[in-house]
Swiss-Prot record:
Protein name: Glutamyl-tRNA reductase
Enzyme Commission number(s): 1.2.1.70
Species of provenance: Cupriavidus metallidurans (strain ATCC 43123 / DSM 2839 / NBRC 102507 / CH34)
GO molecular function: glutamyl-tRNA reductase activity; NADP binding
Subunit structure, interactors included: Homodimer.
Catalytic reaction(s) noted: (S)-4-amino-5-oxopentanoate + tRNA(Glu) + NADP(+) = L-glutamyl-tRNA(Glu) + NADPH + H(+)
Note: During catalysis, the active site Cys acts as a nucleophile attacking the alpha-carbonyl group of tRNA-bound glutamate with the formation of a thioester intermediate between enzyme and glutamate, and the concomitant release of tRNA(Glu). The thioester intermediate is finally reduced by direct hydride transfer from NADPH, to form the product GSA.
C-alpha cells in the first residue's frame, strides 16, 4: 500500500495561488469521490482533503499507483483540472511526500510544527474535521484511519510533553499588533468584523481587550452576528450587528476592518473601498483579510490611505515569537521521529497480511482434503493406526512440497537466502500452539 501526501502551504505558495486551489467545505465530499475515481478508476483508493487558509493537502492510500512520480503526476493533474489551474503553474509550488515522509508530515501538521503560527492548536481541529468529512464520504479505510488516529495521538503527546504552544503569537494577536503600529491607540478606533466564524471570534476577543470605541459585526446570517456582538457587549463595549448586504453603506465608518468569510469571491471590491476612503476624507483605514480565497480584492492595496494585510503579511509578525520555541521544536521532532518508525513498522506488518492469509487458505485446503480422504479410509474399515500414519504423512509431504521444491530449483543468491531463511521458518518453538 502506497501512502502519499501532496499539497501546497504558506511556505511554498502565496495566498494568490492558495486561494485558487482551496476547497469550500460543501465541495469536499464530491471532490473526494472524483479524486478516488481519477487515481484508481474505482473507489479502492483511500483519500482525505485538508483545506485551510494556509494549506490545501491531499492524503491518499492506494495499491494501484506505483510509488514516486506516477502518484504525484496523477494527483497533480486532478488537482489542476479540478480547480482549472494550469498544472505547469501549480507544480513548482507543490510538495509530494511518499510513505514515511507523508506520515511525518501529517504528524508535524497536527502538532502545529508546520503552521505559520508555530504550535497553534486550530489546525488540529481542522484536520479532525477533514477526517470526519472523509469518513462521512466513505473515503477512509484501514490505512488512513490508522494514520489519522495515530496522528491525533502524536499531536496530543507533543502538546502534553513539550512547550510548543508557549509564547505563541496567534494570527489574531498579530492583527492587533499591526493595528497598534498604525494607530496611536486602538481604543479610539471603530472596528468592523466581517464574518462570525472561529477566526473572527478569536480576533474579536483580542481586539475587545483593547477596548475600541465601537465593534460592529457584519455577517450573512445576522442572528449569528448578533450573538457575537452580544458576547462582546458583556465586556462593556459598544457593539452592533449588521447585515452583510449593508456593508457598502457603512464601510466608511470604520478605521479597522477584519474579514474572514467562506465566500469563494471577494466581498469588498476596489470601488467600495475607494468610495469609503473618499467619505473618510482620506483618513487611513486598516484592513486585515484572513480569508482564503480572499475577501478583499488585491487591488485595494494600491490605495494610498489603505493598509491591507493578508494572512501571508501577518506571518512576519507571527514568526517573531517562533525563535523562542526552538527547544520545544527539537523535543517535538524527537517524539515524531519515534512515532513515525512505529507507524512504518505497523505498515510493513500489514503488507504480509495477504501472504499469511494465502498460506492459511492453502494449508486449510490441504487439511480438509486429507481429512476427507482419511474418513473414506475409516469408512471402508481400514486400520485407524494406518489411517493416522497415512494422514500425517500426506500432510507432511504436501506442507513441505513448496519449500523443498524451491530449495531444489533455486540457484545463486536466492538459494543462499532460502538456505538461511527456511530452517528458521520450521524451527520448533516451545511456545507454539498444541
Amino acid at each position: 500500500m502506497q501512502l502519499l501526501a501532496i499539497g501546497i502551504n504558506h511556505t511554498t505558495a502565496p495566498v494568490s495561488l492558495r486561494e485558487r486551489v482551496a476547497f469550500p467545505l460543501e465541495q469536499i465530499k464530491p471532490a473526494l469521490g472524483a479524486l478516488r475515481t481519477h487515481l484508481s478508476g474505482r473507489n479502492g483508493t483511500e483519500a482525505a482533503i485538508l483545506s485551510t487558509c494556509n494549506r490545501t493537502e491531499i492524503y491518499c492510500a492506494t495499491d494501484v499507483l506505483k510509488p514516486g512520480e506516477e502518484g504525484f503526476e496523477h494527483t497533480l493533474r486532478w488537482l489542476a483540472q479540478h480547480h482549472n489551474v494550469p498544472a505547469s503553474e501549480l507544480a513548482p509550488h507543490l510538495y509530494a511526500l511518499p510513505q514515511s515522509e507523508a506520515v511525518r508530515h501529517a504528524f508535524r501538521v497536527a502538532s502545529g510544527l508546520d503552521s505559520m503560527v508555530l504550535g497553534e492548536t486550530q489546525i488540529l481541529g481542522q484536520l479532525k474535521d477533514a477526517v470526519r468529512t472523509a469518513g462521512e464520504a466513505g473515503a477512509l479505510g484501514t490505512y488512513l484511519n490508522q494514520l489519522f488516529q495515530r496522528t491525533f495521538a502524536v499531536a496530543k503527546e507533543v502538546r502534553g510533553q513539550t512547550e510548543i504552544g508557549a509564547h505563541s503569537v496567534s494570527m489574531a494577536a498579530a492583527a492587533v499588533r499591526l493595528a497598534q503600529r498604525i494607530f496611536e491607540s486602538v481604543s479610539t478606533q471603530r472596528v468592523l468584523f466581517i464574518g462570525a466564524g472561529e477566526m473572527i471570534e478569536l480576533c474579536a476577543t483580542h481586539f475587545a481587550a483593547q477596548t475600541p470605541r465601537q465593534i460592529v459585526v457584519a455577517n450573512r446570517t445576522v442572528e449569528r452576528g448578533e450573538k457575537l456582538a452580544e458576547q462582546l457587549s458583556e465586556q462593556g463595549l459598544t457593539t452592533q450587528a449588521i447585515r452583510l448586504q449593508d456593508l457598502g453603506d457603512r464601510l466608511h465608518e470604520f478605521d479597522i476592518v477584519v474579514s474572514c468569510t467562506a465566500s469563494s469571491l471577494p466581498i469588498i471590491g476596489l470601488g467600495a473601498v475607494e468610495r469609503a476612503v473618499k467619505r473618510r476624507k482620506h483618513r487611513p483605514i486598516m484592513m486585515v483579510d484572513l480569508a482564503v480565497p480572499r475577501d478583499v480584492e488585491p487591488e485595494v492595496a494600491r490605495l494610498d490611505d489603505v493598509f491591507l494585510y493578508t494572512v501571508d503579511d501577518l506571518g512576519a509578525v507571527v514568526r517573531e515569537g517562533n525563535a523562542l520555541r526552538q527547544a520545544a521544536v527539537a523535543q517535538a521532532e524527537a517524539i515524531i521521529d519515534s512515532r513515525v518508525l512505529n507507524f512504518m513498522h505497523w505498515l510493513e506488518t500489514r503488507s504480509v497480511v495477504p501472504v499469511i492469509r494465502e498460506l492459511q487458505s492453502q494449508g486449510e485446503a490441504i487439511r480438509q482434503a486429507e481429512v476427507e480422504r482419511a474418513r473414506r479410509m475409516l469408512a471402508r474399515g481400514d486400520d485407524p493406526a494406518a489411517v493416522l500414519e497415512a494422514l500425517s504423512g500426506a500432510l507432511t509431504r504436501k506442507f513441505l512440497h513448496g519449500p523443498t521444491h524451491a530449495l531444489n530449483h533455486t540457484q545463486g543468491e536466492d538459494r543462499e537466502a532460502l538456505l538461511r531463511l527456511v530452517p528458521g521458518l520450521f524451527r520448533h518453538s516451545s511456545h507454539s500452539e498444541r
